[in-house]
């Protein structure tokens, strides 16, 4: 599952599967750390996700091969009759320089996961190029391994109209077009439209006031 940031990928997956996720992990953003420090932080975070899922671990793994071995140990303890659902969010962030993540993931998938008929792995990411190059168009160990591809796009203008109607936001079509040109079809942004204000007032308070919810959004992306 891939698409631009804020489009609703994580929301869609988590709300679809709800409490059926066997293992859920969100990668750390690579913006603040780098090199070996970032790799260790990612591995520690992966360990924390395993612990939250119920696995007892004494120390964090030192490589992605060790990390996926721990994941195999955890998943192997689940009943064969139970559907195992693994969700890795922002997977591209795990592939830090010289981390060996892709090679380790290939080994995990081809050496164990592909043989588990009850396993579903959902890989999600905002870095579209990475998803396409490393997963969808992979020519190595992950060649033709993806069974379902979903590119989540922003809402169309018609879908925006349906969204606003469902959420009690009254706008004529002229204002809907104006709103679409301002914030697009991104559900996250659309959720901030307050039906108690006019479109102009909403845009002003969200984008142009000092503490507006979307004033600094461009820089964050």
Q: What residues fall within each predicted segment?
A:
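Phosphate-binding site recognition
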Residues: 1-221
């Amino acid at each position: 599952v891939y698409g631009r940031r804020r489009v609703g990928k994580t929301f869609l997956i988590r709300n679809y599967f709800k409490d059926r996720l066997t293992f859920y992990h969100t990668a750390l953003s690579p913006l603040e750390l780098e090199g070996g420090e970032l790799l260790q932080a990612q591995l520690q975070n992966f360990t924390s996700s395993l612990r939250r899922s119920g696995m007892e671990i004494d120390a964090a793994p030192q490589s992605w091969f060790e990390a996926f071995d721990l994941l195999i140990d955890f998943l192997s303890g689940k009943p064969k009759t139970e559907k195992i659902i693994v969700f890795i969010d922002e997977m591209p962030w795990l592939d830090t320089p010289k981390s060996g993540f892709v090679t380790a993931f290939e080994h995990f998938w081809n050496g164990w996961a592909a043989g588990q008929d009850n396993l579903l792995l959902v890989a999600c990411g905002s870095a579209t190029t990475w998803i396409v190059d490393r997963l969808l168009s992979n020519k190595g160990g992950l060649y033709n391994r993806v069974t379902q591809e979903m590119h989540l796009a922003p809402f169309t203008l018609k879908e925006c109209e349906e969204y606003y109607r469902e959420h009690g936001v009254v706008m004529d079509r002229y204002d809907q077009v104006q709103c679409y040109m301002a914030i697009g079809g991104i559900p996250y942004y659309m959720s901030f439209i307050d039906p108690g204000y006019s479109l102009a007032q909403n845009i002003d308070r969200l984008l142009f006031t000092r503490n507006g919810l979307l004033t600094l959004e461009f820089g964050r992306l």
